[in-house]
Amino acid sequence: MSKAEKVALYTKMARIRHFEQRCIRVYQQGKIGGFLHLYVGQEAVAAGTISLLGKDDHVITGYRDHGHALMVGMGMNECMAELTGKATGCSKGKGGSMHYFAPDKNFWGGHGIVGGQAPLGTGLAYAVKYLGRKG
């Protein structure tokens, strides 16, 4: 891995951490209702895995989905809008922390049930193969 690639990955991890730290502050201000499942300490997982995916690949994850969402290209403002219940959020402000969603980026969300993404991911993979699509 080149130095430039290492710096790029570190920058992505730092971006995720920055977002999560902002989430903590906004949550402490009482602007985020419900649960807030943070990704602090797991930044390398999303940065490392998603950086290896192609544009046709799909991502589905569990309830700690902020890092994955940012790595697939969702904007910080869109993600924060979802957390604060605004209509400009990725799930129109109704999904909150566990239910980010961006079909235009092949991001099929986080899921509030532990392990719930496994059968959904299996079905997604089957559909991609069955329909002859890339991914």
Regions found by a protein language model. Give the residues of each.
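Charged, compositionally biased N-terminal leader segments and the immediate start
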Residues: M1-V7
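Cofactor-binding active-site loop characterized by glycine-rich and histidine/acidic residues
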Residues: Q21-R25, Q29-G135
